[in-house]
From Swiss-Prot:
The gene is bamE. Part of the outer membrane protein assembly complex, which is involved in assembly and insertion of beta-barrel proteins into the outer membrane. May have a structural role in maintaining the cell envelope integrity. This is Outer membrane protein assembly factor BamE. The keyword rRNA processing does not apply. One of its GO terms (biological process) is Gram-negative-bacterium-type cell outer membrane assembly. Keywords: Cell outer membrane, Lipoprotein, Membrane, Palmitate, Signal. PANTHER family: OUTER MEMBRANE PROTEIN ASSEMBLY FACTOR BAME. Residues 121-176 are annotated as: Disordered.
Length: 176
């Protein structure tokens, strides 16, 4: 009896230890995105002096247009990955009295895009081939050998005559 209890206790602890690395499947949580998606490329297209219409074409409709500050447009974007922390980005565009873009403020600034920041100073990659693998200069095209299929096809193409496009006859306007 004592041996059976000890054996059951050991098996229970071994089973619990084996299940310690397992977990119950969690509920799937979707990514929650809200607001206007604003990219660095969109910000880089903005120039001082652009009209509201041009800015709206590039950026889309602003999320917030303040009634008391009509010369300010706010673009907000937030994303919360399923089960993760919420990240928020904000850009405010300011217009002067003549409805032209005067400045911007926020998490994005004109300059290096995120891709370029990840890749380094330059976003472009230069590939050079070793001298022995470089492509030879363009070879001059040799005429096809007489009697070859290529020569026969070339002759048929050269001898092709244009054919006039047929025009449909007008419909009879008189009723029957």
């Amino acid at each position: 009896m004592q041996n059976a209890k000890l054996m059951l206790t050991c098996l229970a602890f071994a089973g619990l230890a084996a299940l310690a690395g397992c977990s119950f499947p969690g509920v799937y949580k979707i990514d929650i995105q809200q607001g206007n998606v604003v990219t660095q490329d969109m910000i880089d297209q903005l120039r001082p002096g652009m009209t509201r219409r041009q800015v709206r074409f590039i950026m889309g409709n602003p999320l917030i247009v303040d009634t008391f500050h009509a010369n300010r447009w706010d673009y907000l974007y937030s994303i919360q990955p399923g089960g993760g922390r919420r990240q928020q980005e904000r850009v405010s565009l300011f217009f002067n009295d003549s409805d032209q873009l005067a400045g911007l403020n926020g998490d994005f600034m004109p300059g290096v895009s995120r891709d370029e920041a990840i890749l380094g100073k330059e976003g472009s990659t230069t590939v050079t081939q070793p001298a022995d693998q470089q492509k030879p200069e363009a070879q001059k095209e040799e005429p096809p050998k007489p009697g070859s299929t290529l020569e026969q096809l070339q002759r048929e193409v050269d001898e092709a005559q244009p054919v006039p496009v047929p025009t449909p006859e007008p419909l009879d306007p008189s009723p029957q």
